[in-house]
Amino acid sequence: MARTSFQGEIPKEQIGVCPVTDAQNVIAGKWKIIILWHLKETKRFGELQRLVPGISKGILTSQLRELEKDQMVIREVYPEVPPKVEYSLTEAGKGFMPILESMGEWGKKYAINSKKSY
């Protein structure tokens, strides 16, 4: 079965039905989890793009906008020339970090069982 990626608004009837579904709707997408992981510390756009190999500028922009809309990320623009924009986690984003850390630990255990190494 082919994998698909959700694009667009989440149907209203799916919101609030299951807290796991609600969480999944926020972090769904190929890149969001790794973007959140790298935002443990405040980063500029170019730094994020370097840290996430294979992501295009447009996709990174769109994923950051979605994370900002879902109140996981704050975009701060400084009135400087050249323009300076930084991204950081909101309290909700910071609250997700223990889950990401647990996922990382699970990934390490899975890698050992699968004979992979990091």
Describe each region flagged by the PLM.
Residues 14-59, 83-86, 117:
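N-terminal helix-turn-helix DNA-binding core of bacterial DNA-binding proteins
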Residues 63:
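Residues within the DNA-recognition helix of helix-turn-helix
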Residues 75:
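Short beta-strand "wing" residues that participate in macromolecule-binding interfaces
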Residues 2-8, 15, 37, 94-118:
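Amphipathic alpha-helical dimerization/coiled-coil segments
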Residues 71:
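Glycine-centered, phosphate/nucleic-acid-interacting loop/turn motifs that mediate DNA/RNA or nucleotide
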